[in-house]
Curated annotation (Swiss-Prot):
This is Shikimate kinase. Pfam families: SKI (PF01202). Its EC number is 2.7.1.71. Its cofactor is Mg(2+). It comes from Limosilactobacillus fermentum (strain NBRC 3956 / LMG 18251) (Lactobacillus fermentum).
Length: 173
């Protein structure tokens, strides 16, 4: 794995990973997509049929497989880094972990009504902000770099990450 993006839902992980994949000519893996493929159903259906615990087990299994890949950019799910077992996988992935953040107000704006996001659709804006705050320590433990995305375009975020990767590679050489 060349790079892993973490952050709360709506922080820009999927959009930025797609831009990075194009710019760096690397495959892009979205962990939510990997979970849906493994379960043969969309995430809202997994939550409805099997519950969040089952989803988190599927997510862990998918993460374990994806981080083994030599090349690529991974956009994790918003809750992925919260589980300690996932933190260990991210730590041992030997890839820079970039945390994308946004303010609670910007997150609420981006998520809208939370359609397609089982947790967001059940929460008020205040509860969403509380969840974001509660997850922050887990995100911080994993991150090699944090980028606040509120006032940056996805392209600008991707360019910052590419600059970081160049510096990171120079220091590793």
């Amino acid at each position: 794995m060349n790079l892993i993006l973490v952050g709360f839902m709506g922080s820009g992980k999927t959009t930025v990973s797609t831009l990075l994949g194009e710019a760096l000519q690397q495959p892009v893996y979205d962990l939510d997509d990997e979970v849906e493929k493994a379960a043969c159903k969309p995430i809202p259906q997994i939550f409805a049929d099997d519950g969040e615990a089952s989803f988190r087990d599927l997510e862990h299994s998918a993460l374990k497989e994806v981080v083994k890949r030599r090349q690529g950019i991974l956009a994790t799910g918003g809750g992925t880094p919260v589980a300690e077992r996932n933190q260990r996988l991210l730590e041992h992935a030997q890839a820079p972990v970039i945390l994308l953040t946004a303010s609670p107000a910007e997150t609420a704006r981006r998520l809208g009504d939370g359609e397609g996001r089982p947790l967001a659709s059940k929460l008020t804006p205040a509860e969403l902000a509380d969840l974001q705050d509660a997850r922050r320590p887990a995100y911080d433990r994993c991150a090699d770099l944090t980028i606040r995305t509120d006032k940056l375009s996805p392209t600008a975020v991707a360019k910052l990450i590419i600059a970081f990767l160049r510096i990171h590679q120079d220091q590793s050489a």
